[in-house]
Amino acid sequence: MIDPDKTKEMADRFAGINGRFRIFLKKNADPKELDEHFHRLHNEIFYKYDYDCCKCNNCCNLYDIRMEPKDIAAVAGHLGITENDFIEKYLIPDKREFDCLIIKDKPCNFLDSNGKCRIYEYRPSVCRGFPYTNKPDRLYNMLSILDFMEECPVIFEIIEELKKIYNFV
């Protein structure tokens, strides 16, 4: 498994190849088969190799973390504050999406000094679902997957394995 600190460097090195791989998949891959490969590789990394995202935390340090209304309610309740106080203290509007709130600070306000999530049991749905490699319709999300590859070792490893599966060298 690639070192999380080297993921961006390696992804940048392969950016041109990965762009061509995305085009190759769009033209040649069966969407259902590609999803099956994604799901199998996802399961291998997380279950067979027992990968723990909490030891990386690149996503917590670098991404805009979106908060849905149900996430706001859960985290505010856990912290013992009102939703309005939570919004005022921790969130800002996302300039890219109308009516969406994101955590205002990077790294995420809820990481402790050891990089562990202080709200893990109540973490936002966007955090629960990341890296989305076990979701359907991966072919139609390849652009964002490749963007996330810069920071996520799991996505990096899956893309590298997919290149082998599709004989894209």
Question: Where are these predicted regions, by residue range?
Answer:
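Short loop/turn segments that flank or connect secondary-structure elements
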Residues: 1-169
